[in-house]
A protein has these predicted regions:
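Inter-Walker segment of RecA-like/P-loop motor cores
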Residues: 106-177
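C-terminal helicase lobe and adjacent C-terminal extensions/tails of nucleic-acid helicase motors
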Residues: 284, 291-293, 300, 315, ...
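Divalent metal-dependent catalytic cores for phosphoryl transfer on phosphate-bearing substrates
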Residues: 427-436, 440, 798-805, 824-1010
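Conserved strand-helix element at the start of the C-terminal RecA-like helicase core
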Residues: 80-94, 294-321, 330
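Conserved Walker A/P-loop ATP-binding site and its immediately adjacent core
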Residues: 75-103, 107-116, 161-165, 200, ...
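Interdomain hinge/linker at the junction between the two RecA-like core domains of SF2 helicases
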Residues: 220-228, 232-297
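Walker A/P-loop
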Residues: 41-61
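Conserved pre-motif I regulatory segment
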Residues: 2-48
Length: 1010
């Protein structure tokens, strides 16, 4: 239902909206873009110079979505906007912009333009939240469900790999059963905005091809909802005939935009490549000299040093950080998000982001990688940049005097590599060399040999003027393709591929990897997610893999403790292979291939062992040879290996890495009291591990030996001991440990009872194999508050059966109504709304199997047989993995048996009776939605028969009782043909959207305990 027409928004109010949200009026091009989209319904690509606010496309989308709803017009504006950048960012400006917009909408008064926009968005999404802002990152738990409703307006910032793999039904670091939901949300009702599209051209074309295939669906509504694609680059489009939107004279003469377009950036070349044996050292030394030269002439005390690789950036930072006359900060994108958040809170970084004061006592030098090229709103007064491709240099120059206020903004392009072949120069190859050769024809060149600071400083005022208005003349009649990284070979997306990708359960073998369709054929393998744990033990120098896996099940990983690393670099790190680490903050870049010895086949090099999460099997498995480090997987390393510090990935084995496994975003997840973990958190070293271990061991011994009524006192005493000032708390992460221990100290009751935690008391888990280790699980949140539990995936056998005990009839009605509400908010046709409502009623009727009910009663058969109503939810603690497995064993419910298989049998039998119940007009869709509501049946349910078949009585939506035989729950031979027909009818992403609508409704009701 649209907002009342009296509150209808007008396009002319966009300027007031931007003023209220951002504190300034939009530039002329921004207003013109909004009008153009509103009139045509088409989102043109943007050809806008850096510094003129291209991220404002988020504001335009938000306003247009609300405007269209408030006027009662048929919605054509997508409900989700994906802002994609193909690099690792230390600051995600698009996400920060979306978060500020979200907050403004939340805080706005009802009579303001922003308040009216917020009201329209709430009505449209059927939610109390006007807008969600989400960072898309992978995970192996429920945190990967990044949108709660398919109708929720949302801005999602992402990398190419994270968005693209999800679009293609193969989400990296995502549960296989979650992939259809991810694909639906990425491929339907979505606007894909790609920044720096010249390095993400494969994604542009792949997404456009996917949209074209979805448009062939025979269902007209779902055919029209395919993803729409927008490029924010002047040199890249999904196809040659795409409309483009550019600046006009109104922008050139604008008092603010015009000044930015005329910024006085002067470019000088510094050649440090002669006789450079170690190019990294040569870059660091030359960068230090260049910094000194810039300090002589800059008008504000802040300058940047941008390197092409993390290794070079760290080398320059190492030299500059030893000086007392400057403040230095290092920014790289490949770091754990929790480390990144702490770095952004550092006073120097906070000052940089707020704007450096001109009267600052010491100059601030920012050493960085490609991570500052986009996504961060900073302005340097001077710049040193390693030579790179033309596009990269233009982006880096865009960080120099962004406001155009300085009379002189000098930049030094530094070359320390000379090309001998395409692989000599890391990241950019021959494009960097050709760009240098072109610049030499126009800009002054200074040789490093014999150079001193005054000589270089004197050249800076003579540099080449480079800004958005002079750049076109500099590139007249120039083939810029030679100055940039070559366009990759992009494979064609065809229907056979899409049909194969849509088959997510089971996936085809062999399966087509999505990487070539996201980065091109001639690119390196995609990343792996890496995390470190300090409680992974060895026995006689050998890894105890069983203990490792147990620890990971007990405290599953979360997104804030992971970092994405190229698979080849992780192999090099674990095998201690020779050769420089050329890791950059770009994704999917071409790289030199890993060396393969000539002659006969060599055995794999010795490798430090690790642990990998097998998404297909849902288990942690050992990794002992390099080939098992598979791109796209999640890998756990012992903290003692090193490889990461407060700034991010180091690629070196120097210091142990702090274990951040106990600090996800929720406060109710398990916390390990382990001496090795606590020592790294509180002191940064292992000096007092013995004292910590002794304290925990004493408490563990008492918990085993003394009366359970003493449990709370013992745990409280242990926490007091750990919080005692006698234990050092001066480590870099001591505040995290101190805050968590204090929060646990506030828990009033603790118990070691097998039943686990409740809303009133926390649960203490003892480690039978290690007396110096225990785990504390805080009480569950009060009724009505949601909880997402790491490690409980949607594809677990009883995942939908967790949380509080809920009767099956109550849950079925709740899911039916929620699915219907979601479908109505999506403006789906009445027949599809009816189908989703009916599927919601029937989806869990297979849980009436007696052994499944026994499992939901923790294995208590007597209790299950005396229930007044069958259960949908067990009431078991989601964090109690052992308890869940024990309940299934006691009930003799095989972990691969699926209750939805029985539900599908019951729905099929019910439909055979031709019920008069309102259910839509597609019975095949109804059966599929029920069968697929945990991500299976795409196209097959697991072929697992009931070893002890029984008759199951299922209650259907019209209260008719249907009896089915669980012996029939094996292979559904009609499934593949039904799945193929439904994909043709609704499109691959359209069918996935219908599934997602039901599944998200089920998950929401499960979390809420309704």
């Amino acid at each position: 239902m649209s907002a009342t027409l009296g509150c209808a928004l007008r396009l002319e109010e966009f300027s007031d909206f931007v003023q209220e949200v951002r504190g300034h009026r939009p530039f002329p091009w921004q207003t013109a873009y909004l009008q153009r989209v509103a009139e045509s319904g088409i989102w043109p690509d943007l050809d806008i110079p850096t510094g003129l606010g291209k991220t404002s496309v988020i504001d335009a989308w938000c306003f247009l979505l609300a405007w269209q709803h408030s006027t009662g017009a048929e919605r054509t504006v997508p409900v989700r906007l994906y802002f994609v950048v193909d690099r690792r960012l230390v600051v995600d400006q698009a996400h920060e912009s979306a978060r500020d917009l979200q907050q403004s909408l939340h805080d706005s008064g009802p009579t303001t333009v922003t308040g009216r926009v917020a009201r329209a968005l709430r009505e449209l999404g059927g939610s109390d939240t006007a807008l969600e802002s989400v960072r898309m990152r992978g995970g192996v738990d429920w945190s990967s469900r990044w949108v709660r409703s398919p109708a929720q307006p949302a801005v999602i910032s992402s990398t190419v790999d994270q968005y693209g793999s999800r679009l293609l039904f193969r989400g990296y670091h995502s549960s296989p059963r979650m992939r259809p939901i991810d694909a639906a949300l990425c491929g339907m009702d979505a606007l894909l905005v790609v920044d720096e599209a010249h390095i993400a051209l494969p994604l542009l074309r792949t997404a456009s091809d996917c949209a074209a295939y979805q448009a062939t669906a025979s269902h007209p509504v779902l055919a029209s909802r395919a993803v729409q694609v927008v490029s924010l680059s002047a040199t890249a489009s999904a196809c040659a005939d795409r409309p483009r939107h550019s600046i006009t004279d109104a922008d050139r003469t604008h008092p603010v935009a015009g000044r930015r377009l005329n910024a006085q950036r002067r470019l000088t070349l510094l050649d440090a490549s002669s006789n450079a044996k170690d190019t990294t050292t040569a870059f660091a030394q030359a960068a230090t000299l260049a910094v000194d030269a810039l300090l002589q002439v800059i008008e504000r005390p802040v300058l940047g040093v941008v390197a092409n690789t993390i290794r070079s950036a760290r080398a320059a930072h190492h030299l500059l950080a030893q000086r007392a006359d400057v403040d230095v900060v290092l920014l790289t994108g490949r770091s754990r998000s929790l480390d990144r958040e702490r770095l952004l809170a550092h006073p120097l970084v906070a000052e940089l982001l707020a704007g450096v004061r001109p009267d600052r006592a010491k100059p601030l030098v920012v050493v960085a990688t490609q991570t500052v090229e986009v996504g961060i709103d900073i302005s340097f007064a001077g710049l040193v940049t390693e030579n790179a491709s033309l596009a990269a240099l233009v982006q880096r120059l865009g960080r120099l005097d962004r406001t155009g206020d300085l009379a002189l903004a000098p930049a030094i392009v530094l070359r320390s590599n000379v090309q001998r072949d395409e692989s000599t120069i890391p990241v950019y190859g021959g494009a960097a060399e050709r760009t240098w050769a072109h610049l030499v024809e126009h800009a002054p060149v200074v040789e490093m040999a014999g150079l001193d600071v005054p000589a270089l400083s004197g050249k800076l005022t003579e540099g080449l003027l480079v800004n958005p208005l002079t750049l076109p003349a500099l590139l007249t009649d120039v083939d810029t393709s030679a100055l940039n990284v070559a366009e990759p070979l992009i494979p064609v997306v065809h229907r056979t591929l899409i049909d194969a990708w849509a088959r997510t359960s089971p996936a085809p073998v062999p399966d087509q990897e999505p990487a070539p369709f996201l980065h091109g054929l001639d690119t390196s393998p995609e990343d792996v997610l890496v995390l470190w744990r300090a409680d992974l033990r060895e026995i006689d120098g050998q890894p105890d893999f069983d203990q490792w896996a147990t620890c990971m099940r007990q405290t599953p990983p979360h997104g804030a403790e992971t970092v994405a690393i190229p698979a080849r670099q992780l192999r090099r790190f674990l095998t201690r292979s020779a050769g420089a680490d050329d890791t950059s903050d770009l994704e999917g870049t071409p790289s030199s291939s890993e060396a393969v010895p000539a002659g006969r086949r060599q055995p794999p090099p010795a490798m430090s062992p690790a642990l990998r999460y097998d998404e297909r099997e849902g288990q942690w498995v050992p990794v002992t040879v390099p080939r098992d480090l598979r791109p796209g997987s999640t890998v756990v390393l012992p903290a003692r290996y090193g490889g990461h510090d407060a700034f991010g990935w180091t690629g070196t084995r120097n210091q142990p890495v702090t274990d951040l496994g106990d600090f996800p975003s929720t406060d109710t997840t398990p916390t390990r009291l382990d001496a090795h973990v606590l020592a790294l958190l509180t002191t940064g070293d292992g000096v007092h591990i013995g004292r910590l271990s002794a304290a925990v061991s004493r408490a563990t011994r008492r918990l085993r030996d003394e009366d359970p009524v003493e449990t709370t006192g013992i745990v409280t005493e242990l926490l007091d001991t750990l919080l005692n000032p006698a234990h050092p708390h001066d480590g870099p992460y001591a505040d995290l440990a101190h805050t968590r221990l204090n929060r646990l100290r506030s828990v009033e009751q603790w118990s070691t009872a097998p039943a686990g935690r409740t809303e009133k008391h926390g649960h203490v888990v003892l480690d039978a194999a290690d007396p110096s280790r225990l785990v504390l699980i805080p009480p569950r949140p009060p009724r009505g508050k949601r909880e997402r539990t790491p490690g409980v995936a949607d594809d677990a056998a009883d995942a939908s059966s967790l949380t509080r005990p809920v009767p099956l009839p109550q849950h079925s009605v709740a899911v039916a109504e929620r699915a219907s509400a979601f479908a109505s908010a999506l403006n789906l046709p009445p027949q599809l709304v009816a189908a989703l409502r009916t599927a919601g009623h029937a989806h869990d009727c297979g849980k009436e199997h007696s052994r499944f009910q026994c499992m939901l009663c923790a294995g208590d058969r007597l209790l299950s047989e005396t229930l007044d109503e069958p259960r949908a939810k067990s009431g078991m603690d989601p964090a109690d993995h052992h308890g869940r497995r024990r309940a299934a064993q006691l009930a003799q419910w095989h972990p691969d048996m699926r209750h939805e298989a029985i539900s599908a049998l019951a729905v099929t039998a019910w439909l055979d009776s031709r019920p008069e119940h309102l259910r839509g007009d597609d019975d095949d869709l109804l059966v599929h939605l029920v069968a697929a509501h945990h991500g299976h049946a795409r196209p097959l349910l697991p072929a697992v028969a009931d070893p002890a078949p029984e008759k199951v009585t299922c209650t259907m939506p019209d209260h008719q009782e249907v009896i089915v035989d669980s012996a029939d729950m094996g292979t559904d031979w009609a499934g593949p043909d039904r799945f193929h027909a439904l994909n043709s009818r609704y499109g691959p992403w359209g069918l996935a959207l219908l599934e997602a609508t039901l599944r998200l409704a089920d998950m929401a009701c499960s979390e809420e305990g309704t």
